[in-house]
């Protein structure tokens, strides 16, 4: 079955389910018209963006017909492979160099790690915690409620990552920070063909707690107890929402682990080396359990 037809069917099914469920504010983006590419993403080599030349990664262009061109950094472990794959999705502050280094840290843990610029630009909220976004001029910004487009961009990255040389196509996880985590949850419901997900300071604007019975992917929740608007987050990233989601997953006997960092803000991972090291250790151990390495 052609890639575009399969993706359209999956997204249409999710839209039907969400509409008939009668949810009030969550998931309203699902009612938007879905644009589907006529072919799989086209992957080609790219030059290192200005200012990133010293980062020891491979740069790729991931072209998604009708949507734009994503830039992605690929960090590889040493050795011949094949390796399990991890995709790292940035938050609203943009595709900062910190995400490339995050991918490098995961590669040292034994994973073929892909950090894409999956939407361009970046908001001022939380920008103090990271370097300015790496430019992605051939990719538009992502609207606030761009449900279909977000899922399509993530699916294009996942599809491209699975096809990389040395990748284990049957073992792939997603790590999403803030909006990256929130849209990962959307992706899990719409497509769901991954083996693990790390929800990092994740936004719960779509209230995924209302659909916990439909999640079938092992999840790791990493969240600071002080996360909120005062430190780069929002009302949708407050820790109470993460705790409610965890509790609902457990009540539905879903596979979930959670670590809460006392006093940690929305972006403390990027500013506190002690917390960062602990989070990396925790997520690598989790990913190894479900992906191998």
Feature-to-residue mapping (PLM):
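C-terminal catalytic histidine-bearing segment of alpha/beta-hydrolase fold enzymes
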Residues: 250-293
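Serine-hydrolase catalytic machinery in alpha/beta-hydrolase-like enzymes
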Residues: 62-73, 82-163
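Alpha/beta-hydrolase
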Residues: 89, 116, 200, 261-264
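Short beta-strand/loop motif that positions the catalytic acidic residue
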Residues: 215, 221-223
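N-terminal cap/lid segment of alpha/beta-hydrolase-fold proteins
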Residues: 35-80
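Primarily recognizes the serine-hydrolase "nucleophile elbow" in alpha/beta-hydrolase
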Residues: 62, 93-95, 152-215
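Active-site-adjacent alpha-helix of alpha/beta-hydrolase-fold enzymes
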Residues: 225-257
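Glycine-rich His-Gly loop
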Residues: 88-93, 202, 224-225
């Amino acid at each position: 079955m052609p890639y575009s037809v399969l993706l359209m069917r999956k997204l249409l099914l999710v839209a039907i389910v969400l509409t008939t469920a009668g949810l009030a504010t969550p998931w309203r983006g699902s009612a938007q018209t879905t644009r589907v590419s006529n072919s799989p993403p086209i992957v080609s080599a790219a030059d290192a963006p200005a200012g990133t030349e010293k980062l020891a990664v491979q740069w790729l262009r991931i072209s998604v017909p009708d949507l734009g061109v994503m830039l992605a950094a690929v960090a590889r472990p040493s050795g011949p492979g094949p390796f399990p794959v991890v995709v790292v999705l940035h938050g609203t502050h943009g595709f900062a160099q910190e995400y490339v280094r995050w991918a490098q840290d995961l590669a040292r843990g034994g994973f073929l790690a892909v950090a894409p610029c999956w939407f361009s630009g970046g908001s001022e909220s939380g920008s103090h915690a990271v370097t300015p976004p790496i430019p992605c001029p051939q990719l538009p910004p992502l609207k606030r409620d761009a449900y279909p487009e977000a899922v399509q961009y993530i699916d294009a990255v996942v599809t491209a990552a699975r096809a990389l040389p040395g990748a284990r196509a049957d073992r792939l996880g997603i790590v999403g920070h803030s909006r990256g985590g929130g849209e990962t949850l959307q992706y899990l419901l719409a497509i769901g063909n991954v083996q693990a997900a790390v929800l990092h300071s994740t936004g719960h604007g779509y209230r995924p707690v209302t659909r916990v019975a439909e999640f079938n992917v092992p999840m790791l929740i990493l969240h600071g107890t002080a996360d909120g608007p005062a430190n780069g987050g929002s009302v949708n990233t407050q820790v109470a929402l993460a705790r409610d989601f965890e509790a609902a997953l457990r009540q539905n006997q879903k596979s979930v682990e959670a670590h809460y960092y006392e006093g940690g803000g929305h972006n403390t991972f990027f500013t506190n080396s002690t917390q960062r090291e602990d989070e990396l250790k925790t997520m690598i151990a989790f990913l190894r359990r479900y992906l191998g390495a």
